[in-house]
């Protein structure tokens, strides 16, 4: 019996932060990485248009690749429509990436938390439900950046980043009141961990930056049968699919470092 792959989906290359952690736990599984970079960034899409687009894309992806599990490695999509995906495709296992607010609430000492996300994730009702459920006793600052995901894409491609602009994007995360300071910042976009060293350099004061990728990887492993992570050899190669034609040599090099061969210009809405 052929092993079914695990499929990762994101609007760009941010989902690689989750893929690399899953690979550590189940390295012999085949991974397919789908980057809908023709639609990047999702944070600027109207909700209904984005929902319809994602449903069409997944209809084709599931037909083509029949994955054992789909990782929606995009906070914007995960906070918008995980319920829709599970309802539309009831026989497919979906794992989303949502802001790690519960973990932040457990770890904060000051009670002051910031959630650094895209504008789409910030405005979602689901994000506020997480705050009400797990961080009701905390002061939670929601910060939606329109630039950081693109900065991460550029940074990984070796392009220069305007550090002053980056600093301005994260400044609202640092909040002080009555002698208490923000001590925990949730990275609520899978792109952002790629910028973590720059964030630390530009921070107003030391904070704990929470990247949920390791926790997501452990959750994914817990959902899979043991035979998937006790195999001795990898039978099928991993690969990446990009929906645009605009793939630079630096992107190809990056994906090669992740062991992913690229196919570009794939249209999953057909």
Swiss-Prot record:
Transmembrane segments: none annotated. Pathway: Cell wall biogenesis; peptidoglycan biosynthesis. Disulfide bonds: none annotated. Keywords: Cell shape, Cell wall biogenesis/degradation, Isomerase, Peptidoglycan synthesis. The active site is at 74 (proton donor/acceptor), 189 (proton donor/acceptor). Its EC number is 5.1.1.3. Pfam families: Asp_Glu_race (PF01177). InterPro entries: Asp/Glu/hydantoin_racemase (IPR015942), Asp/Glu_race (IPR001920), Asp/Glu_racemase_AS_2 (IPR033134), Glu_race (IPR004391). It catalyses: L-glutamate = D-glutamate. GO terms for biological process: cell wall organization; peptidoglycan biosynthetic process; regulation of cell shape. Substrate binds at residues 10-11, 42-43, 75-76, 190-191. GO terms for molecular function: glutamate racemase activity. Provides the (R)-glutamate required for cell wall biosynthesis. Belongs to the aspartate/glutamate racemases family. This is Glutamate racemase. It comes from Bartonella quintana (strain Toulouse). The gene is murI.
């Amino acid at each position: 019996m052929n092993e079914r792959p695990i499929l990762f989906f994101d609007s760009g290359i941010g989902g690689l932060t989750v893929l690399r952690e899953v690979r550590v736990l189940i390295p012999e599984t085949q991974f397919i990485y789908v980057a809908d970079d023709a639609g990047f960034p999702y944070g600027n899409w109207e909700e209904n248009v984005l929902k319809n687009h994602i449903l069409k894309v997944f209809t084709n992806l599931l037909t083509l690749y029949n994955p054992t599990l789909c990782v929606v490695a995009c906070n914007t999509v995960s906070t918008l429509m995980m319920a829709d995906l599970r309802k539309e495709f009831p026989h497919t296992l979906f794992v989303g990436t949502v802001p790690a607010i519960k973990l932040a609430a457990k770890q904060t000492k000051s009670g002051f938390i910031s959630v650094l996300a895209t504008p789409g994730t910030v405005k979602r009702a689901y994000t506020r439900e997480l705050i009400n459920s797990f961080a009701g006793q905390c002061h939670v600052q929601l910060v939606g950046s329109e630039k950081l995901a693109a900065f991460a894409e550029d940074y990984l491609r070796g392009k220069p980043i305007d550090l002053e602009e980056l600093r301005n994007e994260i400044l609202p995360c640092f909040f002080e009141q009555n002698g208490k300071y923000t001590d925990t910042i949730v990275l609520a976009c899978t792109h952002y961990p790629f910028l973590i060293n720059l964030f630390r350099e530009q921070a107003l004061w030391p904070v704990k930056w929470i990247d949920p990728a390791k926790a997501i990887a452990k959750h994914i492993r817990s959902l899979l049968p043991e035979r998937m992570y006790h195999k001795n050899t990898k039978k099928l190669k991993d690969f990446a699919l990009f929906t645009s034609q605009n793939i630079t040599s630096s992107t190809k090099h990056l994906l090669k470092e992740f062991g992913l061969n690229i196919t570009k210009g794939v249209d999953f809405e057909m």
